[in-house]
Amino acid sequence: MKYLNHVAVTATVLAMAAGGAYAQEKKTLAIVVKGLDNPFFEQINLGCQDWASNNPDSEYECLYTGPASSADEAGQVQLVDDLVTRGVAAIAISPSNAPAMANRLKEIAPEIPVMTVDADLSEADRTLRATFLGTDNYLMGVMMAEQAQRLKPEGGSICLQLGNVAADNINARAAGFRDTIAAAEGTDRLNGEGGWTEIEGCPVFTNDQIDLANQQMADVFTSNPDLDAFVLIGGWAQFAPQAYAQVTDQVMDRLESNELIIIAGDTLPPQVQAFNEGRSHAQIGQRPFEMGQRAPDVMIQLINGEAVEDPIYTGLDVCTHEEPGFCAQ
């Protein structure tokens, strides 16, 4: 399967390189996401397109791309390699596997501006990029923890659902969550701190696969009928509304009584719908459209040698049933 993804990625790059006169006219600002199968990243694409429509006379074009599958870490690294070889003007990367991406950047030593968007490189490797544009992911985890504490002041049993084990943004959110609950930095696992205990078998890792995320939720609910809280550090399961509805149908009575609470990251349309149906208690929303919309301008600043802030944070939206805010119907 990975071979097929690599072929698709290479074919995409070759097709772009063969674009003829248009490719000569416009210099390319590339945004490389973790995978084209994730609707969160489609919002970044819409932001990229919006920038292009608002800057028709620019000498630059905004190119949104990524491997076909979010699970194809090697494909993403290869795509970045191919784009740098092709000669894009600048590149913004959301690294799926931060150490692997950093290792390749060290090897190819691109002379073009490199930045990260949505997800960053590991702290030790951040000199390899000029800036990060996206969410304050540690703060996002803090805000998730605050909702858990508000909804269940006494704590309880909890399962965290994470993405890729090497994704810096997801790990930062998990750290923010655990540190806030425990009131101590560097908390690796909750074992009674603040009244909360992570159950055996958790955290679970989705590897950014939506179907797996829903199956994991179903399995956890079945194996732990008295679970107090399930936290989707990213939105994965909710990106498939039918599957997510089926999974939460089995625990709707517990959700309605707040015996079981669900807190999730992101506020894409299917997630807002699920929230308004009572299938989650709080959503902490990122702003991916803004990331895609702002990334080209930041890359142009870097090309021009201008100073840019590092990091550049986009905001967060909090939805609760008491104050639905962004998620209001």
At which residue positions do the language-model features occur?
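A residue-level marker of the well-folded mature domains of exported/periplasmic proteins
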Residues: Y3, A21-Q329
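Bacterial N-terminal signal peptides
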Residues: A8-A17
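Bacterial N-terminal signal peptides that target proteins for export
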Residues: M1-V9
